[in-house]
């Protein structure tokens, strides 16, 4: 679900990239590509952080009848899978952007290699890590897919150094969100109450932190739901730019 949501919002930018490709506007491709990547990361990374921090509470709510050993297995597997959320979202959005540039063959090659690696890693890890091997196979598939697709996209569009700074900012904010969510997970024992309060507080803090840090510039999110509210908040928090 987090991957679907992040890709659904980010992929709305892909037609603009296709239009820029037809005009051979490399700057526009690079700019809109950065927006799509940041949007996918902002949503998927936060979702992954919440999954990891509240993994024990999520399992307790969804599967209250599991015994202790089963619960520990499910929690660990959920934590492993949480790493695939941002990587899966990025893999899909980079693939969509490459196809918008009309380089579909590159995606076929990259996906074929990623699937082959996933099968190999899963087969090896299952013999050593049991059920967790499937999770490690998913991580390998997503990670290699991101690396290959991102490499091809930036070969086609050129590097974007500002995006590196923005991604670093998003990562730093999510570290803080993890610590905040982890505190709720530790100190509130009731699973439902911990999840509800922790998620609401962390979500609010996350939006404020993203707006304050200026992850998105100007009209970068034009057409995205709630973009006007986000920019109004960002302008108030970044008052020194007014």
Label every model-predicted segment.
Residues 52-85:
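Interfacial segments at transmembrane-helix termini and the short loops linking adjacent helices
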Residues 182-242:
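Membrane-proximal transmembrane or re-entrant/amphipathic helices at the cytosolic face
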Residues 6-37, 95-97:
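Helix-loop junctions and terminal segments of transmembrane helices
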Residues 94-102, 150-165, 216:
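Alpha-helical transmembrane segments
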Residues 105, 112-150, 179-201, 220-221:
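Membrane-interface helix-loop junctions in multi-pass transport and translocation proteins
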Residues 82-113, 124, 128:
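Membrane-interface junctions at transmembrane-helix termini in multi-pass inner-membrane proteins
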Residues 32, 37-53, 65-69, 128, ...:
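Short alpha-helical transmembrane segments in multi-pass integral membrane proteins
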Residues 1-7, 11, 47, 84-88:
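Transmembrane helix-bundle signature of multi-pass secondary active exporters and lipid flippases
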């Amino acid at each position: 679900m987090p991957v679907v949501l992040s890709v659904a919002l980010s992929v709305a930018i892909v037609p603009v990239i296709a239009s820029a490709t037809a005009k051979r506007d490399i700057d526009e491709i690079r700019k809109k590509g950065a927006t799509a990547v940041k949007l996918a990361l902002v949503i998927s990374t936060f979702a992954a952080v919440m999954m990891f921090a509240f993994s024990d509470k999520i399992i307790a709510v969804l599967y209250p009848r599991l015994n202790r050993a089963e619960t520990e297995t499910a929690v660990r597997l959920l934590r492993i899978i949480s790493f695939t959320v941002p990587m899966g979202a990025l893999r899909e959005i980079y693939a969509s952007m490459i196809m918008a540039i009309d380089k579909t063959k590159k995606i076929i090659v990259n996906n074929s290699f990623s699937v082959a690696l996933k099968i190999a890693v899963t087969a090896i890890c299952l013999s050593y890590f049991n059920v967790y091997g499937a999770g490690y196979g998913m991580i390998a598939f997503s990670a290699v897919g991101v690396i290959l697709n991102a490499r091809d996209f930036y070969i086609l569009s050129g590097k974007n150094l500002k995006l590196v700074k923005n991604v670093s900012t998003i990562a730093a904010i999510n570290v803080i969100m993890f610590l905040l969510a982890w505190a709720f997970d530790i100190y509130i024992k009731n699973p439902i109450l911990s999840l509800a309060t922790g998620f609401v507080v962390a979500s609010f803090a996350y939006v404020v932190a993203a707006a304050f840090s200026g992850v998105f510039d100007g009209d970068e999110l034009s057409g995205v739901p709630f973009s006007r509210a986000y920019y109004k908040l960002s302008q108030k928090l970044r008052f020194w730019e007014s």
